[in-house]
């Protein structure tokens, strides 16, 4: 396996571990606030899901017209910086609002970085190695999804929220360094795409929407996925309170692991 492919896989694995740690630590902390936590958990998740709903369609259009590596580097650096700042907040009230604000900001960046990563893979990985790379990426993602909640439980239970935020910051910066060390020219930036404007991005989004509507099978799958996500949203809201519901500190981590395992 080429070095750049290894760096790309390592970057994705580290980033995913950080995301699980961040969400687990924040959710358990907010859920532990009692009745106040029930209300603010809704705000916390609404900020993420609402932003994702509106910005995900834009992410692909932006990734097509800008350098994907730069998007990934900027989002990782800002994510690491914000988590580091959060870790030094001493007031619980400020921390609560800070977690919601940073989660919203990370949702904005995720809308662009997720699409950019998938598109950047084509730049780094040769065409004849894409299938093998994607299979390795999927295996690593599944392993991380299953193991990270248990690791997050052990770490958060032992050290608390602030050290978890510091660890999240480290994962973002480590992902940044791995991506920064990759040197591959991005050839998708044509002369036309250099002259990017809001109008051109909106035109790309419109063309994508028309394509989805015309392709009935894709449209049907998206409708089904939306319906499934509606029920998953209810589960995601209740899951962080499972530690209190089942009176066991590892209940939430167990649910996340079982969900990842399918």
Put a short name on every predicted segment.
Residues 7-24, 44-61, 67-82, 98-157, ...:
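Substrate-agnostic recognition of the 12-TM MFS/MFS-like secondary transporter fold
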Residues 77-93:
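C-terminal ends and interior cores of transmembrane alpha-helices
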Residues 1-5, 185-222:
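Juxtamembrane intracellular "pre-TM" segments in multi-pass secondary transporters
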Residues 36-47, 246-261:
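Loop-to-transmembrane helix entry
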């Amino acid at each position: 396996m080429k070095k750049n492919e290894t760096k790309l896989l390592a970057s994705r694995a580290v980033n995913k571990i950080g995301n699980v740690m961040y969400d687990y630590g924040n959710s358990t902390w907010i859920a532990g606030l009692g009745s106040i936590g029930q209300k603010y958990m809704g705000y916390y998740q609404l900020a993420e899901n609402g932003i994702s709903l509106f910005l995900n369609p834009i992410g692909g259009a932006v990734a097509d017209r800008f350098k994907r590596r730069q998007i990934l580097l900027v989002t990782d650096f800002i994510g690491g910086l914000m988590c580091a700042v959060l870790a030094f907040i001493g007031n619980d009230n400020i921390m609560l609002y800070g977690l919601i604000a940073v989660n919203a900001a990370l949702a904005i960046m995720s809308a662009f970085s997720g699409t950019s990563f998938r598109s950047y893979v084509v730049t780094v990985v040769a065409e004849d190695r894409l299938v093998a790379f994607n299979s390795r990426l999927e295996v690593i993602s599944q392993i991380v999804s299953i193991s990270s909640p248990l690791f997050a439980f052990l770490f958060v239970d032992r050290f608390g929220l602030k050290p978890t935020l510091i660890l999240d910051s480290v994962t973002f910066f480590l992902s940044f360094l791995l991506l920064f060390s990759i040197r591959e020219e991005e050839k998708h930036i044509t002369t036309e795409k250099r002259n990017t404007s809001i109008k051109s991005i909106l035109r790309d989004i419109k063309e994508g929407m028309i394509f989805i509507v015309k392709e009935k099978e894709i449209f049907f799958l998206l409708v089904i996925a939306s319906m499934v996500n509606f029920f998953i949203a209810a589960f995601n809201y209740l899951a962080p309170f499972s530690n209190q519901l089942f009176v066991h500190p590892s209940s939430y981590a167990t649910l996340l692991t079982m969900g990842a395992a399918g």
